[in-house]
Amino acid sequence: NVFAFCESVKTMSDVGPHQRWAMGALYDNQVTDGLLAVQDGCNNGSGHGWRGTNFILWNCTAGQIVCQSPWVTGLNWCVGCIGTKEPGRRKDRPDGEWISHGTPVCPSSLYEWQLQSRLENGIILTPLLL
């Protein structure tokens, strides 16, 4: 899953995965004036627990950013993002991988770079219908 080039303003909640272990998504060039978060949601609401694993936040801009990783089962990445680094709801949870915080990286869009690379190399992904 990819969320690319989205903008959220005057948000009433955080931007990011919600409830019970979402797996493997890319947030590419997200912009929000609020909180962008991949974290342990604890017992928030109806028992969120870990909200996501194997997430990449790529060149996003947010008022605040939380990027935590589960202890043993995956990593979350915050790469080239701009925004105030926050500890999250549970401050004792491990940090995700923070790379180039405050300075965007190249390629400017990981999604577009991967798509272009795949198309140039003739790799066609065929959907699997069940």
Where are these regions (language model features)?
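Right-handed parallel beta-helix
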Residues: 1-12, 21-34, 46-61
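Acidic/polar loop patches that form or flank catalytic/metal-binding clefts of enzymes
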Residues: 13-14, 34-39, 64-70
